[in-house]
Amino acid sequence: MAMMTGAQYSESLRKLNTRVYMFGEKIENWVDHPIIRPSINCVAVTYDLAQDPQYEDLMTATSNLTGKKINRFGHIHQSTEDLKKKVKMQRLCGQKTASCFQRCVGMDAFNAEYSTTFEIDKKYGTDYHERFKKFLEFVQENDLVVDGAMTDPKGNRSLAPHAQKDPDLFVRIKEVREDGIVVRGAKCHQTGSINSHWHLVMPTQAMREEDKDYAVSFACPSDAEGLYMIYGRQACDTRKLEEGADVDLGNKQFGGQEALVVFDDVFIPNEYVFMAGEYDFAGMLVERFAGFHRQSYGGCKVGVGDVVIGAAALAAEYNGADKASHVKDKLIEMTHLNETLFACGIACSSEGHATECGSYIIDLLLANVCKQNVTRFPYEIVRLAEDIAGGLMVTMPSEKDFKSDMVVGRNGETIGDVCNKFFAANSDKCSTEDRMRVLRFLENICLGASAVGYRTESMHGAGSPQAQRIMIQRQGNIEGKKALAKAIAGIK
C-alpha cells in the first residue's frame, strides 16, 4: 500500500468502530465532531507533508525492514542523521500546526520497543523482537497511526503496582491463555489516542518481581473488544461548539487531543505481545522510550515556539510598538530560548549511538537536559508573548460583538462599529480583525486549549521535571568529574 494522504487518513478513521465518550455521552460520529476534528486535521498534516517533494527528505525514510519508502513517523532510526532528521521533522510539523500533531509518542515507542525486545530475546530466548518487527512491517505497509501508551493512573504514588488497593490502577495481565493474554487497566493522558489506528502499550515504570504481572507490553487496534476511550477536556474547548466560531478559537483548524484509554478485559493474541512478565526489562523500555520522547520535545515544542514568536512580533507591529527597544529585546530572548531547545534536540541526536540490534538511540544525558529545559522555557516564552501582546489578549469582546449590527449609539452606531472603532490600533498595518486574530491565537496558546500542548505538556509530558533530574544525576558522572578536579588540584 502506498503512503496515505491526509484525506485518506481521515477517511480511514471512519472504518474503525472506536468507542469514544465525551461529556457523559457516546460520540457516534467522532471524526466530524467539532471538538475532535482539529486534532484529526493535525495528524493529517503529517501525511500531506510526506507527499510534498519539498519536505520528502525530512518526512520520509527507507524502511530497514522492507527497503520501501515510508513515513518517517514509522521509521526505526538507523543513524545519527536519522535522529537529527526526526527533530527537524518535528519542528516542521509544529510550525505547520502550532499544535501537538500526536504521532511522536508512537514513533518513540517503536524505537524503544525495537531495541528492548531484541535484548529480552537475547536473555530469555523469547521471540518478541520478531513479533515486533512483523507488527511494525504491518504498520509501515498500511501507513498507520499508532498511539504509544505508557502512563498509568498510578493511584497512590507511594505504593508499587501490586500493592495498590485497586489492582487495575496499572495495566496488568489478568489472564494467560495458550493463544494470548487478557489485559485490564487504563492509560491516562493519551495524546492522539482516538485518532490512532492501533495502540502500543508499555509499562509505566521499572518493576520488581512482585510486579511482574504489570510488566507487559502489547499492541491492539483502537476498536478492540473491551477497549474504549473517554475524551479529556481542555480550557475553552466548548468555544468550538459555538455556531460560526472562527476568530475566537485562535487556531480554528488545528488542535491537540488527550483521552483516558480503558482496557476492560481485552484479549491480546500472542503475535502482538512484546513483554509478558519480564519485569527486569521494564525499566530499560521506560528509560529508552523516555529518552526518545525527551529528544522529541527539542523539535515539536520548538516548531510551536516559532509560531508563538511570530505571533508576538505581529502583535507588537499591530499595536505600533514593534520599534520599541524593549519589545525587540523580548523577541530576542524568546528566540534565544527557543533555539536553545532546538540545540539540545540536535545535540542529543548528534551524540547518539547504535544499540545491540543496530538501531540508533540518542545520548540519554543530553536528551534529559533537553527536556529539563523544555519544562521551563516555553513558560517564559509565553510570559514574554503575553507581555508584548497586552491585556486585550484576555479582555477582548467576542467575534459576534465585532460583527453585531445592534444599534447602541446616539448616532446609530452598532456594537460592531463601537468595537471596531475602539480596538483599532496601527491601522496602516492591519485591520481590527487581523489584530483580533493574532491576539486570540496568543490567548489560545498561552492559556486556552492549545496551552495544554505547549505549556502543561512541556512540564509533564515525557516525564515530569524530577524524572529528568534523576536521570541527569545517574548519567552525569559526578565521580568522574571529582577525579578530574583532584587531578587538577593535585589531590592524591
Label each PLM-derived region with a short phrase.
Residues 61-198, 203-218, 223-228:
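Glycine-rich flavin
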Residues 28-91, 356, 457-461:
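N-terminal low-complexity or amphipathic/hydrophobic leaders
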Residues 328-332, 360-368:
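Short, charged, amphipathic alpha-helical segments
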Residues 296-355:
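Extended amphipathic alpha-helical segments enriched in small hydrophobics
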Residues 365-492:
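Alpha-helix capping/hinge segments and adjacent helical runs
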Residues 41, 137-140, 182, 303-306, ...:
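Generic structural signal for well-ordered, non-transmembrane alpha-helical segments
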Residues 1-49:
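N-terminal-proximal low-complexity accessory segments that begin disordered
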Residues 148, 153-300, 470-492:
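FAD-binding core of flavoproteins
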